[in-house]
Amino acid sequence: MAQHLPPVGGNGGAHTQPSLPALPAHLQSDTHLTGHLASRFHVSLPTAKLSSHAFISINTYTSSSKGQDGGKAGSAQGEAEDMADRAFLRLGHRSENQAILFLGESGSGKTTIRSHILTALLNKTSTPLSTKVSLAAYVFDTLTTTKTATTPTASKAGLFYELQYDTASTTSPLLIGGKLLDHRLERSRITDVPTGERNFHILYYILAGTSAAEKTHLGFGEPDAGTGSKRWRYLGHPTQLKVGINDAQGFQLFKTALRKLEFPRSEIAEICQVLASILHIGQLEFESSENTTVAGDESGGFSHEGGQITTVAKNKDVLAIVAAFLGVSAAELQTTLGYKTKIIHKERVTVMLDPAGARANANELARTLYSLLVAYVIENINQKICAPEEAIVNTVSIIDFPGFSQQSSTGSSLDLLLNNAAAEAMYNLTLQNFFDRKADLLETEEVSVPPTSYFDNSDAVKGLLKTGNGLLSILDDQTRRHRTDMQLLESLRKRFEGKNPAIGVSAATAKLPGSNFLSENTAASFTVRHFAGEVEYSIKGLVEENGEVISGDLLNLVNSTKSDFIARLFGQEALHTVTHPQERTTVMQASVSSKPMRAPSVMSRKIRPGTARTTRQRKESISGRQDTLDDIASEAGDSRRPVNKPSEEGASGQFLHSLDNVTKSFHAQNTNAYFVFCLKPNDRRIANQFDSKCVRTQMQTFGIAEISQRIRSADFSVFLPFGEFLGLADVDTLLVGSEREKVEAVVDEKRWPTNEIQIGSTGVFISERCWMEIAQLSDMVTGRFGVPESEGGTPLANMPYGASKERLIAAGNSPYNNDKAKSGYFGSNDIDGRSDAGVSAFGGGDMFKNLDTREQMAERGNEKSMVEVEEFKDSPSRKRWVFITWMLTFFVPEFLIQHLGKMPRKDVRMAWREKLAINFIIWFSCLAAAFILVVFPMLVCPTQYVFTGEELSAYNGKDGKASYAAIRGQVFDIGSFIPRHPLPYLPSKLFTQYAGTDITGLFPVQVSALCQGTTGSVNPAVLLDYKDTNITDSPNVFNSQDLNSRYHDFRYFTNDTRPDWFSQMMITFRGTYKKGNIGYPAQVVQKMAQQRNAIAILNGRVYDFTKYIAGGRDFRVKYNETRPTDQSLLDFMDPSVVRLFSDRSGEDVTPLWDALRLDPTLRKSMQLCLDNLFYLGDVDTRNSVRCNFAKYFILAVTIILCSIIAFKFLAALQFGTKNMPENLDKFIMCQIPAYTEDEESLRRAIDSAARMRYDDKRKLLIVVCDGMIIGQGNDRPTPRIVLDILGVSETVDPEPLSFESLGEGLKQHNMGKVYSGLYEVQGHIVPFLVVVKVGKPSEVSRPGNRGKRDSQMVIMRFLNRVHYNLAMSPLELEMYHQIRNIIGVNPTFYEYMLQIDADTVVAADSATRFVSAFLDDTRLIACCGETSIANAKSSFITMIQVYEYYISHNLSKAFESLFGSVTCLPGCFSMYRIRAAETGKPLFVSREVVDAYATIRVDTLHMKNLLHLGEDRYLTTLLLKYHNKYKTKYIYRAHAWTIAPDSWKVFLSQRRRWINSTVHNLIELIPMGQLCGFCCFSMRFIVFIDLLSTIIQPVTIAYIVYLIVRMVLTPDLVPVLAFVLLAAVYGLQAIIFILRRKWEMIAWMILYIIAMPIFSFGLPLYAFWHMDDFTWGNTRVVTGEKGKKVVVTDEGKFDPSSIPRKKWEEYQSELWDAQTSKDDTRSEASGFSYATKAPVAVSEYGFPVNPYGAYPPSRPGSTTGIPHMPHMPYSASRMSLAHSEMLMAGNRQSQFGGSQFNLPQSGSEMELSNLAGLPSDDALLAEIREILRTADLMTVTKKGVKQELERRFGVNLDSRRAYINSATEALLSGQL
């Protein structure tokens, strides 16, 4: 039985024994050991020793520094410091590397014990570096720890912290550096915070610790109302913001730590901005929106014209904050988040994301930012604290990985798997150390140790971690191969089923409940039997998660950042990028490293002894990074890289590699290991409570009983050869005997236990305790090296959070108990005094004070790097228009448009001014039309409210008529007066008898009260008779003899004299009841004058002096008064006035009245008398000439409008004959552009085109796919959908070929693939050609997408070059080859092209109808058919369009067709004549049409409306412009159905496009004098009327409303006739569909009429104002040097020579030469690919050089699904055309001389170099040697070497870049 040490602690209780192996054998079970730990725990001794290099610590959830009696002895901190002392001793005295490994579950206190050990080690060296090392650990924990359900600070990343020492010169090691190695941060937590837990602490710190000014800058804002806290998506529930953690103080400490680690203030601020942007990314909300802003790269049919469904951010303010901090444009960020580019089957495909997908994309961005930020901070810390590796002698490694978990709190299977794999590996290291370490040496030394049984987890470790065929390796391999989850599961089954008991795999298929059939098992998983329990891992999504692919869209976005910090963040080595194999500067995707950027120093020295290795951050941009020369030198032999490239490794592969490094460093020779077992006392974090079951489970998990048993047998830590042992023992030299005998004597003297010392054949195995005793170092352990604890340390030492923020905290207390301890991250007594002042100043205030504001960042992010493309001159017409625009909008200042309108760009502001000017013109036109239709007639003939006698008689109160009566020439409504009569009791019949009559006689007047005479007064006794027959001798006159007149007689002679009664009564009547005046036409006045009446017209009023002249004057006085005798008193009117009316009776005396010499007072008096006593009425001018003109003018306008509609009706009736020749032998093409349509739409369109009743051999189906895009709702990219429909296998993969595209800058260079074959559907076998625009390798987002116009141009430009025999691009040559050699038809044979949209279905006889029309009329250049709505009943929006579609075709287009000039041929269904039938002259593809339609610079409002809004209409305009001798027609019998917009927003946008494009195209057509017809019968007149009717549509509706109102109010003949005419002509429309038996159109017409205000009023007004609603791109015209206008763009300058071109004959000749010289013995044919010209003379891929660049040969069968050999069947097609040509073409070879194996021809490079006058390789190599000999390798770059070579040789060396780079690398790596 082995002897053991006596119990420590005297004769106390059982708890006094600190060593578990020292307990008796019967107490060595799990239960007894747990009991012993419990007894110690309850007396505040929560630790126990296992051996001199291992101890157990139990978390008390209180202070970690208090043991029994409040002292440090027995506490966790005490044991930690004791272990640190022993490690330090061994480090100094034995020069061994030390490794301290922590094991324990989450919440067991590992992080705290680790901080104590770290603090104790750092306290032993009093250097400023120790503070930095301590601060580095704090920063690491701040970034990687979080609060979980088990602990307030759980580590979520593996830590390998290396302290670097120089132990060569002294036994007191000198700290010279440190190295932080982080292993696999739990990234899933960043965006998915588990319930009840927190995210990483730093995110809470920044939210709580920033000042008010800083919060404002970071956009944190105010808390939500009602909750008191803002709900942050990435911070979990708001309650997690207040969980007893002092976040504000933690943030201040974090900033201080970074500052002391020499991070610049600006960089700390940038770090905070990135953290804030991550929080804001979590706040982004997304929604689906119909993007109606027009862009030049749009495609698709009618259903796309109004806009496409895109995903946008709801909260644009939050988006702007994120964009500003990232240094990018908010619009670009939103676009990037709405798309995601993936690599599917080696193809880049852009997926249009829905809101959920955009949210996931934003989460990916947040995870990427945080991961890169952590990597950046750690790498920069390492740069500050890491020593050169040649100076490192020994290291102390602190290893702490997250504890084992049964399930993932974040739902990530990958994080759970990797975390548990690390725990498994660490536990295996522990077992090997205790049970297997030194086993070989023991056997060699012939020392036997009793075997001890233990649980061996080797099966699990091998199954998980074995390189090549372990589970993590298999997962990595499957990820690299892009396999599915089920394929991974199958691979795991093959590998482990029945071979490894630790891993079990579930079935891939299962029977669903209620089904007897096997289906895919959605719950498939695999199970791993870990040392701590069995865990089931779901297979779902594991492969994709392991890839951790960062989309190329995000990288492309960041590549344009204006933030230097963001550029550095994404430029570091931690970001592994995947570049395009053919364009190395293009990053397709990337991933953040899951392993440290550095390797342990032990590993580095072992692999590369004596070589320093530093890992630096790459500072180059993503797209064009250049490795510095020292990077190349350091990486040349860096074995830390795996066999596979980092970009090819998934997370599991990288993590496995990093674990392997940890394991190797742990097992390295000269490394001594220590172990700390951390246990939880209970699962509920209750302080001072010991749960025996919980602890016993952990004891069993870690096998502590077996370890203790093993230590009882063998506790050997040191092996000392006999000589070294005797030297340490200081044995008396006089002792006689051999070394072994002397050793045995010493051992016998020491009486050490046998489990701590064994004597071998050449040396002694001894425990650490015995070694320290014999080396006389035991006393040094109890003391402390360095600064005593009583001395003051750094001021930060007394701060809360003294250790690691996971102190062994007390429940309910703050987790920041300092316990008055000088330990923790800031526990060192030395600080970097250099930065104290800066730190204190930095801690308060605003860290962003001297940095750019958020607005400045946003402005900088919107800036573009512009490149000058070309000079530009405005045309004279443009200059005139700009002048008019400024003249109309001068009053709007520029700064208002710029700031209030948010239009920083000058060209956008100019477009806005143009829009405003156009709107002014349109509004003026509308006002002018309204003036002419409404105001002008009123000015010519003002409205008169007069009544003739007959008209007055009609208002007699009968038959519902009103009751009017006349008094002294004025008409009043007595019907309204009757109820208000002063005597209400009088019967109404008494009053109604006077209705329709003149009742002047009922109201006698007092002359003196109404007239002042010539003297100023008239005698009150004067009377004047009233002529009672003055209304055209009408009998309806009541004279003064009426009995009722006496009730109104208040004249002077009556008893009741009231002279002013009549005046007052008339004032009341005029104000309330007046309806007008009596009207006398001028003819009637003349007639009355002829009847001896003294009547005349004065100022349009009729006055009668008949009674005055005839003696109707008299005196009448009261009873008993004397009658006046002076007869002159009766002449109260001036004689000249009386003579005027008597002499000029029947005339208009106005000029004579004005000529009378009257005193102004007298004239005024006479006028008063005329108006009161002699007035009869007004002159009635309603039947005058000018009033008749105004009346019939309205009628004439109505007739003109209706005549146009009538002509359209007649035109619609012209097409009644049926013309269909039987045999049509013309070749036609049918082009279908595809964008993001679904499979159903595409199949309908393709099938309908293929099923057309036309000779299948003579029609060619051409589908042009506009980009590699997966539309929303689709599961495949559109090109793949098209190819699947056509039956092209996925194995057919032709090479992408270059061609010209419509785009800005470098986007003019595009690449595409060509497929061809035969499509069979319902008995039709139709040849097809598919062109897929895939884009250049440098295109990341929406590769290849250029728009529908570009898709048309692909075919138009191809046919143009075919017919003009011009040089063609590689894609066009391939198209020519496919059509001619594969399909078997010469491209020149095709005469007609039918263009339909991908959402259009054509009738079976459409092609026949069109072609027959072309054959009937050789002057016909293009025609269209009738397009109906396929989804008519899907919504009200589509319903109101049905009739409009019908009428627009059958009236408007039919009418225009009469003139042979249909101005708009819709692109959804039109056919064009490619060439003239007689001469073969190109028509549709003529040079003029193609060049004009291919306009690239579309930067003015007019051009954008032409080419971006209505390219189909503009194409028609060009045909009419350049081929004016030809016609365009409408063929109503040709029919098609399309999808119309079914939502209001899309409909509004579509009509905005149509209306505005109509206006601008008609403006283009009006100046064209070639249009047919003349004068008002010319097409120009019709075009003008169309333009005018378009811009005044709102007035048209208002005019119709005006007619209706006027008809109701004044139902005279003319308005009724006008309205009847208008209604009748619109009724003619009904005749059309009645004749054609379209009865359903009746209902559609009613809906259309209801919606007319929308079509004619609302839509035009909306369209005109939104005329400038475009995506403007980044190409614009600016003023350059010397005032010249230049075109600039941020897309780069396009070089046309980058796309090589050849004529077909030359190309065919080279093909034939290559074919005839081919070696017939070769077994595999290689198709030629005429690829893009390379920018260098020698391809870096090893291809040969030729005048057209370096071209890789295309793949076999690269052209089509049609077989190259007749005997090879093709599953989806039949081969019936041109077999001989096909055989020749199928056996092609590259004409550039290279073989299919991509081997260059020998000597080609040298020959080209010499021909170009370039230096030879030897000359270059010699100069490179010289440059590197004198250069600073820390700063020089390969680019710099090349530039220096160019300077020395005086030539451009771009073509030699590849050689220069390779030679430079070879020189640095020692290969040359």
UniProtKB/Swiss-Prot annotation:
Carbohydrate attachment residues: 123, 291, 428, 559, 661, 1030, 1055, 1120, 1450, 1556
Stretches that traverse the bilayer: 881-901, 920-940, 1193-1213, 1581-1601, 1614-1634, 1641-1661
GO terms under biological process: chitin biosynthetic process; fungal-type cell wall organization
Pfam family, one: Chitin_synth_2
SMART domains, per database record: Cyt-b5, MYSc
Binding site for ATP: 104-111
Residue ranges occupied by any DEK-C domain in the UniProt entry: 1814-1869
EC numbers, comma separated: 2.4.1.16
Keyword tags: Actin-binding, ATP-binding, Cell membrane, Glycoprotein, Glycosyltransferase, Membrane, Motor protein, Myosin, Nucleotide-binding, Transferase, Transmembrane, Transmembrane helix, Virulence
Gene Ontology CC: one annotated term: plasma membrane
Membrane topology of the entry: Multi-pass membrane protein
Induction: Expression is induced in vegetative hyphae and infected rice leaves.
Gene Ontology MF annotations: actin binding; ATP binding; chitin synthase activity; cytoskeletal motor activity
Classification via Gene3D superfamilies: 1.10.10.820, 1.20.58.530, Cytochrome b5-like heme/steroid binding domain, Homeodomain-like, Kinesin motor domain, Myosin VI head, motor domain, U50 subdomain
Region of interest called Disordered, as start-end residue ranges on this chain: 1-23, 587-652
Domain Cytochrome b5 heme-binding: 944-1003
Reaction(s) this enzyme catalyzes, per UniProt: [(1->4)-N-acetyl-beta-D-glucosaminyl](n) + UDP-N-acetyl-alpha-D-glucosamine = [(1->4)-N-acetyl-beta-D-glucosaminyl](n+1) + UDP + H(+)
Disruption phenotype: Results in a 31% reduction in vegetative growth. Forms colonies with short, compact aerial hyphae and wrinkled surface. Reduces conidiation over 5-fold. Leads to increased susceptibility to osmotic and cell wall stresses. Does not significantly changes in the chitin content in vegetative hyphae, but reduces the chitin content by approximately 40% in conidia. Blocks appressorium penetration and invasive growth.
InterPro entries for this protein: Chitin_synth, Cyt_B5-like_heme/steroid-bd, Cyt_B5-like_heme/steroid_sf, DEK_C, Kinesin_motor_dom_sf, Myosin_head_motor_dom-like, MYSc_Myo17, Nucleotide-diphossugar_trans
Annotated ranges, domain Myosin motor: 1-779
Region Actin-binding, residue ranges: 659-683
Protein function: Polymerizes chitin, a structural polymer of the cell wall and septum, by transferring the sugar moiety of UDP-GlcNAc to the non-reducing end of the growing chitin polymer. Required for appressorium penetration and invasive growth.
Protein family according to the UniProt entry: Belongs to the chitin synthase family. Class V subfamily.
The protein's name in its UniProt record: Chitin synthase 6
